[in-house]
Amino acid sequence: MLGKTIDELVLGETAEFTKTITEADIILFAGVTGDLNPAHINEEYAKNTFFKTRIAHGILQAGFISAAIGMKLPGPGTIYMKQELNFRAPVHIGDTITARVEVSQIDEEKNRVVLKTTCSNQEGEIVLDGEALVSPPKKPKE
């Protein structure tokens, strides 16, 4: 199954991926990436930060953008080429994060698409935003 090709995409088209952050997500992400920053995994340490509690890794939310791109828009077969990120607010265990991608530019000649990317929490607060450059899948040659 392939995602949408360049000629099937429409400016303003959107897709979302939603996930609630769990303790296991943070511990597994720390283990996979090697990012054992105590702000993420040590509650006693985190109590003394300006967040006052542990926070999720910012890049964990960026992974949700990757899921929206790779599985929904444009979807399977998409090549993720570039991502700019701005971390706007902390994410905590129990927060429900919705990654949203929106087609903002289409370059049919180069088979490139620019996507506006955001992650919002359950309150609608944007916790991360940015822009992605992708190459959508091409139709298989017959």
Each predicted region: which residue ranges?
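HotDog/MaoC-like acyl-thioester-processing domains
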Residues: M1-L11, V91-E142
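Mid-chain, well-packed structural core segment of small domains
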Residues: M71-D95, A99
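A broad, low-amplitude sensor of folded, mature protein cores
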Residues: F29, N42-E44, I79-Y80, E84-N86, ...
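Well-ordered beta-strand positions in beta-sheet-rich domains
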Residues: T14-T18, E84, D129-L133
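Hot-dog-fold acyl-thioester-processing enzymes
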Residues: M1-T78, K141-E142
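Short, charged/polar low-complexity linear motifs in solvent-exposed/disordered segments
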Residues: G34-D35, A46-K47, I79-M81, N111, ...
